[in-house]
A protein has these predicted regions:
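A ligand-binding cleft/hinge motif common to bilobed small-molecule-binding domains
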Residues: 1-21, 138, 154-164
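A bilobed periplasmic-binding-protein/Venus flytrap-type ligand-binding module shared by bacterial periplasmic
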Residues: 18-42
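Local pocket/hinge segments that shape ligand/substrate recognition
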Residues: 19, 56-71
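A short acidic, helix-capping loop that chelates divalent metal ions and anchors anionic groups
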Residues: 26, 100-105, 161-162
């Protein structure tokens, strides 16, 4: 056997047929924020009217969609993030460039699955949507200091994230 033939005999097969893990992705709001239920309601409505599927297909992420549970917005009586956002007139979304979730088009505008869904939430709130590039390692601090209102960027919902954000 030649060297190449011998190598092929011992070539490793790195193909796995089993799924090793399942990751869940989502947006992150401040702990106790009523913005969480507003986003959940908006996502549920977008699923019901077909908007969620259409946006997912536009960016090729439809296989990642999960069923959105029915959700009704519950406003906080004290320290409402929704009221705060409406008062200032802007939903500030913390992102990083992460296609197909958030990235810039040829004109420098933010697009992507998460960017489009964040714009939909801002539209439902009746406010402008502003995207701010954040240092990913400081995302919780950015939220807590109100530099941003939501982290929305293909974020894996780890135990650490779930403990620090809604």
């Amino acid at each position: 056997l030649s060297y190449q033939d011998k190598f092929k005999l011992y070539e490793p097969d790195l193909t796995l047929g089993d799924m090793l893990t399942e990751e869940k992705y989502g947006a992150g709001c401040r702990v106790g924020s009523d913005l969480t239920s507003f986003i959940n309601q908006t996502m549920y409505e977008a699923q019901q009217d077909g908007t969620l599927q259409a946006v997912a297909e536009k960016y090729g992420v439809q296989a990642s969609l999960v069923e959105q549970p029915e959700s009704v917005f519950a406003a906080s009586e004290a320290d409402s993030d929704v009221a705060y956002i409406k008062d200032k007139g802007t939903l500030v979304v913390g992102i990083t460039e992460f296609a197909p979730m958030d990235y810039k088009d040829e004109n420098g505008n933010w697009i992507g699955f998460d960017a489009d869904m964040a714009r939909l939430v801002a539209e439902k709130l009746g406010v402008a949507c502003e995207f701010v590039v954040i240092d990913w390692d400081l995302k919780i601090m950015e939220l807590d200091s109100k530099s941003i209102d939501v982290v929305w960027n293909g974020m894996t919902l780890t135990q650490g994230v779930l403990a620090a954000m809604n």
